[in-house]
Amino acid sequence: MKVQDKQHIRAWVSGKVQGVWYRNSTRQVAERLHVLGYAKNLPDGRVEVLAYGDTEAVNQLIDWLHDGPEAAIVTEVKTKQVEGETPPLGFEVC
């Protein structure tokens, strides 16, 4: 796989996304898609997601972030391309 076939993004997810199993569900979906990175709660109530993997898989994860698990109410997902960072080794819940 060529490097240009990979995508590295950071996403910030707003809404009712803490205390609803959002991070663990994100990890489960990411692992199924073979996407590396992390999901962590932020003090302002959002969840930050770092994702690295095949472009199609990362795009599928981004699509899923807009819905999240059943108990979540996602109001916004902002994404930004990441450049110059070492890709993560697995997917962690922080």
Curated annotation (Swiss-Prot):
EC number: 3.6.1.7
Molecular-function GO terms, alphabetical: acylphosphatase activity
Keywords assigned: Hydrolase
Catalyzed reactions per annotation: an acyl phosphate + H2O = a carboxylate + phosphate + H(+)
Record has Glycoprotein as a keyword: no
Acylphosphatase-like domain mapped to chain residues: 8-94
Domain of life: Bacteria
InterPro entries: Acylphosphatase, Acylphosphatase-like_dom, Acylphosphatase-like_dom_sf, Acylphosphatase_CS
Active site: 23, 41
Leading EC class: hydrolase
Pfam families associated with the record: Acylphosphatase
Family the UniProt entry places it in: Belongs to the acylphosphatase family.
Name used for this protein in its record: Acylphosphatase
Organism: Hahella chejuensis (strain KCTC 2396)
Lineage: Bacteria, Pseudomonadati, Pseudomonadota, Gammaproteobacteria, Oceanospirillales
